[in-house]
Each structure stands twice: as structure tokens, then as C-alpha cells.
Amino acid sequence: MKLKLYEYLGLIIGLLIALEPSYIHPDEHFQTLEPIFTAWTGAKGTATWEFLPENPCRSITILRLYYTPLLWLNQHIFHLKPLGLLYLYRLQNYLLYTAVVIFFLEFCEVSITHKTKAKFFIRTSYVTWVFQSHTFSNSLETIILLLFLFTCQYCIYEVRSRHYATFSSCFLLGALISIGTFNRVTFPAYLILPLLSVFYHCFLSHWIGVAYTAISTALVSALIILFDTKAYSSTDCKSWVIAPLNNLLYNMKVDNIAQHGLHPRYTHLLINLPLICGPIILLFISQKAVLKLPALSCISGILMLSLFRHQELRFIIPVLPLLCASMNLDNFDTFFQAETIITSWLVFNIVMGLIMGVFHQAGIIPLISYFSGEEFPVHIWWKTYSPPTWMYSNPDLTVSTTNFKENVEFVDNIPWHVVSNHVVDLKGSDIELLNKTLTKFSENTDSIQLIMPNTVLDKLTPLQSQWKFITEWETQQHLDLDHIDMPDWTTIKPGLRLYNVSLIV
């Protein structure tokens, strides 16, 4: 009874966190909403490397299938500004994931007691509240993966009841393989062992099912390639666009991955997995696993993704529901210190939910929303995550950033004469580049605004003899974890500020 209450509270907390302006990683905007919103509305934004026509690494078709319906509804019915639209997408992601989990657990061949406890752990997890509600391609990957495993289990059920898998089930299986792969090239990593199991149980004596699945995969893939090629051809792409292949070839080169960060190959297993599971990692270690499709998918995914040197936590967020469905939780109530584990689990997820879902980089989105659809001067972003420029909703927007020459950062490509509706992303550049940027713009305008987190306020001290910084906008709901200089506790300063900057005459 207590777990059921906590489960429902977890659902409510997830809804509330979905409506918070936290910002986990730039990819939640630049791999999804940035390209689709700017293409739909005609607003200017940031063109990331994945969507450059020279080597397209992301499928536009998948984005259109998933994100266009709400854009259409917003254009014709809701008329929400970008902030409201963002919250609408987060609610869509969260509610869809919650619904899919229910169907997924129904076909996991576990007891009702196990399902109840699995739903409790899934719904009270900060991974569900935060990562699954945000607009990551990883969030959609989890949903597609659960639908895939559900379909696999249904195929096995059909073979047991009527000795063959139906055409519709096999066709859906192939379609999900294709859609999931074109959404994220990492998707097949989770499929290898489950597909071997399905082949053994369903297709070994019924090869027609393999044919149906293969035809479906090929047909859906061909359609996506066709639509992607058409989409990119309008921007000078001259050959067939196979986005997952381009993405895989890019990530096979260590030099390319190094630009995004290299990690030890044990990062997923020893760091990211415990961060996802928290205290219940003890259950997964001590309890016997039910070696069904979810467990096979989990093992397959972690092992395959650990081969690559770039390992972020969000790459393995699908493992949370898989692990919860795989562990034998029927005897959890008699497990040593079960109450302690539940208490520590709830505390862990509330803390992580507050940090990641409420405060993390949470000042950026409200600040941009303040200027959404309006004229503004030069905005210089310094020591923050890259601003999601689609939220400016500005057809006259100019976006500039730094450039590198032999690993040295410069600001050579910034058009200094553009002094209105101009966003300059200085990222984590040093104080000298900030000073140069301010100086160059001051030669053309006296309307310059600087956005920066409170964690680096002390770094402005050398410039205060030359520049006047007047606070125009400020929020305390902003936690910058990237510039905390431990063990100097004074650098832990929540908040984000917008300054009006002018020369001291």
C-alpha cells in the first residue's frame, strides 16, 4: 500500500518536474527542437554539425514524425510561445513513456508482485522525471526500445499459442528496428541479444517471419532514406542520405569522438550505471536476474556501448526500465534492509530530481523566453550551456561562436557590425576573449548585454576598471556545476545574470 502511494506521488512529481525550466545537455535542443522548429516556423537558429548537408548524421524524417504534430496543433490551436511549446513536448514525452512502460511490463512474463515493485522503482526514479521528459533523442530511443521488446514478447506469445508469428507483428518488429536505428545509431546495440532470442523462439522453424521482418525493415528504411534525401537535397545534398551510416562512420574515428570527450571504457558500467540506479544497484547485484528479453537487451546495450570511448549517462537511460523488469523482486519485502533501501532510494531520487530537474542550468530558458519574438541587442553568452536559439523565435537572428586554430580559441568569425538580434556563444572561453568581444562590439554599438552564471562573478574583476556592468535581469534558479572550483566552496553560487555592459569613459 505504501509503495502504491509513493508510486502515485512519483507520477505527480514527474509531471511537476516536466514543467520546470532545467537544461540538462545542449543535445536536448540542438538534436531535436532546434532544427525542426526553425524549419517549421522560418525562425533563424543554430545549425549543428549533425545536420550539415555535407555529411548529414541525423534523420530529419524521424524528427518530423515525432515533433511536427504538436507544432501543427500549436500553430492552429494553442498558439503558445516557445516556452509553452517546450513544456508541452516534455509532457508529451513523460506521459507517452509512462503509458508505454505499462504495456511493456504487462508482457514481461513476471508476477503481479514484481510488476508492482518494478512500476514503483521506474515511476519514482529521477531518470523518469528528468531524462524521459526532456527532448533527448535518447528519451525517444527508450520509448521505441520498450515498444520493440513488447512486440518481441508478443511474437513469442503468438508462436506459443498458434505456432507462428503473424505478419502484422513481424512487420511492426521490422518497422521499429528501422525507426529506432534512424532515431539513434546506438539503438541496434540494445537489440542484438533480444533478436537472437526471438529468432530462436519464433523464426528458427518459421523462416517466413524472418522474411516479413527483413522486408519491413528494408521498406521503412528506404522510405526514411528517401524523405531524408529529399529534405537535405533542398540544402545542396547531392547523394542518398543514410543518416545512421554517416553517424556511425563519424563515431568510428577517435579524432572525431575526442572533440566531444573521451572516457574510459568502464564509464558506463562503473559510473553511469550506479548514477542511474542509485541505492537499488544493491538489488541488482544481490538478486537473481530473470534472464528474459529486458535483461538480454540491457546486457547487450551496455556491453556494445562500452566499446566506444564517448560515454555519457544519457546513452544508457533505457537500462532503468529494463533492469527493473529483469530483477526478481517477488521476495523484495524479505530482503535484508528493504525499508532502508526504499528510504535511501526515495531520498536519492528527490535530491537528484531537484538538482537535475529543477535547478540545473535552469536560468537559461526563462531568460531567452523573456526575449522570445522580440527585438534585442547583442547577447553575449559566457560560461553557460549553449543557448537554445530556437526559443528566441526570431526570423532575423544572427548566431556566432568561437573558432579554433591548432587548438587555440579565437573570435575571428564573428560579424562585429551586426548589433541587433545577435547571439554570441563564447562557451567557456577565457577572460581575454570576453574582453576582446566586448571591445569589438563597443566600436559599433553601446547596447551590449552579457549573460553569465554567478559561479564566475569573481572572474569579472579584472574588467571592472574598464567596463561598467549593470544587472538588468537575474534569477537564483540556476545551478552551474561546470565552473565549481572545489574545494573552494565560495564558487558554489546559484544564479544567472544579464548585464548591460558599457565602457567607462
Swiss-Prot record:
Q: Which InterPro entries match?
A: GPI_mannosylTrfase (IPR005599)
Q: Name one GO cellular component term.
A: endoplasmic reticulum membrane
* Positions annotated with a glycan in the UniProt record: 435, 500
Q: Name one GO biological process term.
A: GPI anchor biosynthetic process
Look up and give the membrane topology term.
Multi-pass membrane protein
The source's domain of life comes to Eukaryota
Q: Which UniProt keywords apply?
A: Endoplasmic reticulum, Glycoprotein, Glycosyltransferase, GPI-anchor biosynthesis, Membrane, Transferase, Transmembrane, Transmembrane helix
GO molecular function: any one? alpha-1,2-mannosyltransferase activity
Enzyme class, spelled out: transferase
The pathway entry for this protein reads as: Glycolipid biosynthesis; glycosylphosphatidylinositol-anchor biosynthesis
Pfam families named in the record? Glyco_transf_22
Where does the record place it?
Endoplasmic reticulum membrane
E.C. number(s) listed in UniProt: 2.4.1.-
What stretches pass through the bilayer? 5-25, 94-114, 139-159, 163-183, 207-227, 266-286, 288-308, 315-335, 345-365
Q: Which family does it belong to?
A: Belongs to the glycosyltransferase 22 family. PIGZ subfamily.
Instruction: Summarize the protein's role.
Output: Alpha-1,2-mannosyltransferase involved in glycosylphosphatidylinositol-anchor biosynthesis. Transfers a fourth mannose to trimannosyl-GPIs during GPI precursor assembly. The presence of a fourth mannose in GPI is essential in fungi.
**This protein's name:** GPI mannosyltransferase 4
- UniProt lists the gene as SMP3
